[in-house]
């Protein structure tokens, strides 16, 4: 369990620290208005949703070994984005729409690493349940929340006052490389599990996904459309309230990372 716990903790820390770091980096380029942070959050929320969808499709459609292969390629490709410092070529020009420029800038700067980090929580928890049958993954979920909170609290009080932006970028990039190593260690038992399933005559991805379902999966009823709609509505409402509160604080006080994180 230790390797999965450390991997999920580090990924959650990096996932939430890169948000204020990137926003702080590009803030002066686009005039310092509250809309800059809103555009950043739009990008991060889209990639977060995409990461969850990727994890679901990966674990429900591909064999265990194929999952490791596909995810390994994705993780290795994401290293090409390091270090994550935005290039000056992305600075806006007069009359250009800032939203599209910000989205393209973020995609070119942190897109792949952020997407990989977004996949880690659900993917590693699923891999953990397969390789550790009978052990609950909910402690890993709680640990990811701890890592996220620590990242948000440490940035305005520790990293931003002490390190330059360049040093922050390099520190984050080094820690991301460490995360890649940890993710590889988590993939090893899944690879061995896939080999054992093939030896047992379970070869296809869907067949392996069915055979790896836990007893809890079988007992859990499928949620109704009303329940899923309520989940979607509540999630959207919380995001809207978060952005509205953050924007109002930035308008009334100042556009600084601490106020982005506070809500």
Residues covered by each model-derived region:
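Alpha-helical transmembrane segments of multi-pass membrane proteins
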Residues: 1-263
